[in-house]
């Protein structure tokens, strides 16, 4: 099978800001904490200063998971790890948009799990718990009611009830 690597900027699917971030452009360095690489994780671990009460989070998670049957041991272990100040979460999330589909969710989740495993190998004295956060209620409809396709903005102008109730589209044909 022939495989060709396509650079992000060649896809014309990412903003110039995203391209600069991925290319570690020093012009944007003042606006971010760290570029994503192993050296950055070493600095983050070294400079962490979180002092919150972890037991509150652990207790709530244990309550939420108590009625789930046949839980994998990894879930129980990860919740337990959160008690320790030697534990970090590796968090990803997703805000709804039109062109990602279910495979993108799976990709993000698997990538986060793999990063947590890789960091555990690199920093064995720490634990890394993968967290997937579904950004379903943190946005305004105006943030997700449009997309760009072939240089044109396509907007869904009607049909918003609330962040937690599905919008009812008007003017669209029945399936």
What are these regions (language model features)?
Residues 1-175:
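N-terminal targeting/trafficking signals and adjacent low-complexity tails
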């Amino acid at each position: 099978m022939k495989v060709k690597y396509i650079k992000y900027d060649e896809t014309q699917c990412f903003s110039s800001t995203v391209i600069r971030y991925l290319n570690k452009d020093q012009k944007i360095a003042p606006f971010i904490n760290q570029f994503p690489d192993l050296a950055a994780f070493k600095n983050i671990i070294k400079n962490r200063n979180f002092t919150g009460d972890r037991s509150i989070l652990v207790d709530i998670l244990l309550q939420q998971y108590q009625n789930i049957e046949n839980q994998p041991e990894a879930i129980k272990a990860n919740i337990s790890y959160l008690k320790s100040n030697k534990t970090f979460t590796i968090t990803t999330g997703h805000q709804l948009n039109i062109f990602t589909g279910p495979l993108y969710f799976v990709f993000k989740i698997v990538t986060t799990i793999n990063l947590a495993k890789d960091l555990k190998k690199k920093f064995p004295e720490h634990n890394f718990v993968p967290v997937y956060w579904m950004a379903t209620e943190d946005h305004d409809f105006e943030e997700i009611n449009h997309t760009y396709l072939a240089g044109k903005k396509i907007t869904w102008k009607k049909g918003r009830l609330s962040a937690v109730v599905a919008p009812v589209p008007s003017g669209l044909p029945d399936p």
